């Protein structure tokens, strides 16, 4: 598809660098034929290495803890609902932990201020949502529902564009 930029996570940089080496060598031998791909890393530090939906170190196809760009809306909703949160946050009134909570890691990566206006107008910011969760009185399902809305909005244009090429 003549891509010049490849969006990757930090763990994929070596593979792209290897491809760049091959392109340089190929072009040296056969003339300027191939485009050397540029690496595009996310600006947001939370996106550099997203954990798997089960809270494990990273997404893994073999562990089944990935959200794919090709997932349907129902598949994404199911995966978000099953995401790892704070195991000690058993009731809505219990205080919850943010650190290590996969749902909040994904919110850090994907949430933008305009999402609150559309999907959670009672909260002005992600910081306020986190503070309420830590105080108690905010359930996991409400936070997961918010994340699901964000993921659907983010991935829908990608899914639609992908369908054009299938």
Please name every model-derived segment.
Residues 1-12:
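Conserved alpha/beta enzyme-core scaffolds, especially Rossmann-like or related mixed alpha/beta domains
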Residues 14, 20-166:
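Conserved nucleotide- and phosphate/pyrophosphate-binding catalytic cores
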């Amino acid at each position: 598809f003549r891509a010049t930029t490849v969006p990757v996570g930090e763990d994929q940089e070596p593979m792209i660098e290897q491809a760049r080496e091959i392109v340089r060598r190929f072009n040296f031998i056969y003339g300027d034929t191939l485009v050397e791909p540029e690496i595009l890393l996310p600006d947001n530090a939370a996106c550099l290495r997203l954990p798997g939906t089960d809270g494990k170190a990273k997404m893994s196809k073999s562990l089944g803890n990935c959200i794919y760009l090709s997932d349907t809306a129902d598949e994404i909703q199911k995966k978000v609902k099953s995401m790892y949160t704070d195991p000690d946050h058993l009731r809505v009134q219990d205080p919850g932990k943010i650190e290590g909570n996969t749902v909040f890691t994904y919110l850090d990566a994907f949430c933008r201020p305009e999402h609150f206006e559309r999907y959670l107008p009672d909260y002005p910011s992600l910081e306020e949502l986190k503070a309420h969760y830590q105080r108690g009185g905010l359930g996991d399902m409400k936070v997961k529902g918010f994340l699901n809305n964000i993921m659907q909005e983010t991935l829908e244009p990608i899914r639609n564009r992908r369908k054009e090429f299938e």
